[in-house]
Amino acid sequence: MKIVIADDHAVVRTGFSMILNYQNDMEVVATAADGVEAYQKVMEYKPDVLLMDLSMPPGESGLIATSKIADSFPETKILILTMFDDEEYLFHVLRNGAKGYILKNAPDEQLLLAIRTVYKGETYVDMKLTTSLVNEFVSNSNQDTANTSDPFKILSKRELEILPLIAKGYGNKEIAEKLFVSVKTVEAHKTHIMTKLGLKSKPELVEYALKKKLLEF
């Protein structure tokens, strides 16, 4: 099977490439350092599996990239690499096209099993995070009302500028510098956006922005 590895740390890309290329049934055909490059590599190489880090640099979110790649290249199975810090994103990543996720510090044997599992079209879930995923599913199962709202009727022009930047992972200071406003202004707008849209977390905001097509690479 052909595999693309996307991670912003070169040492991780190199390490995983060595492990996978040692397998008779696996070949790493390309690597990528961010979400944008991952999309380009998948488009070029048409891999069977994309092994992708969820934590990407601002502007190139792993969640955003997952959604776009899954929509454009459904034949490529996406396996997410994650750390415990990313737990709140897991439900949203799986709902937006990933076939599974695995912890970065998982044993090599578990990584290989996860890759072969998603390659077959099955879902792989790291058992250490299953409880978090179930809890997130329960809390979100009846919480889709915000997704039906029209952002162009609810949000102000400035809020429509800020929302995509938040979703892409930019911090308050970076957004303030981009829009030439104060950090306090950005914080106030962020609060208003979450309140107006009925959102409770950043992953929900990212998913909302994706569904409303407010994000582009």
UniProtKB/Swiss-Prot annotation:
UniProt superkingdom: Bacteria
Pfam families (alphabetical): GerE, Response_reg
DNA-binding region: 172-191
Molecular functions per Gene Ontology: DNA binding
Cellular compartments annotated: Cytoplasm
Residues with 4-aspartylphosphate modification: 53
Alphabetized SUPFAM superfamilies for the sequence: C-terminal effector domain of the bipartite response regulators, CheY-like
Record CDD domains: LuxR_C_like, REC_NarL-like
Posttranslational modification: Phosphorylated by NreB.
Key word Hydrolase present: no
One of the GO biological process terms: regulation of DNA-templated transcription
Protein name (Swiss-Prot/TrEMBL): Oxygen regulatory protein NreC
Organism: Staphylococcus aureus (strain bovine RF122 / ET3-1)
